[in-house]
Amino acid sequence: MAGMALARAWKQMSWFYYQYLLVTALYMLEPWERTVFNSMLVSIVGMALYTGYVFMPQHIMAILHYFEIVQ
């Protein structure tokens, strides 16, 4: 039973990856180009998440002070 669930999850992830390749047109690139693109994408998303994690609390507190929700 667990094997079937794992196989179904693998099939679903393969389908999502295939859709990702089609939507971004990565299926036309060579493997090394695809690796470069994916590396850059992961780096940019990682930096955006880190920046949001670091600076978002400061901005939220500034907004709350501006609207006098927090003293």
UniProtKB/Swiss-Prot annotation:
Cytoplasmic domain ranges by topology: 1-12, 58-71
UniProt-reported outcome of changing residue 28 to K: Within the serine palmitoyltransferase (SPT) complex, leads to a strong decrease in SPT catalytic activity with L-serine and palmitoyl-CoA as substrates
Stretches that traverse the bilayer: 13-29, 35-57
Record bears the keyword Thylakoid: no
Record-level GO BP terms: ceramide biosynthetic process; protein localization; sphingolipid biosynthetic process; sphingosine biosynthetic process
Subcellular location, record wording: Endoplasmic reticulum membrane
Membrane topology of the entry: Multi-pass membrane protein
Family membership noted in the UniProt record: Belongs to the SPTSS family. SPTSSA subfamily.
Protein name: Serine palmitoyltransferase small subunit A
Annotated organism of origin: Homo sapiens (Human)
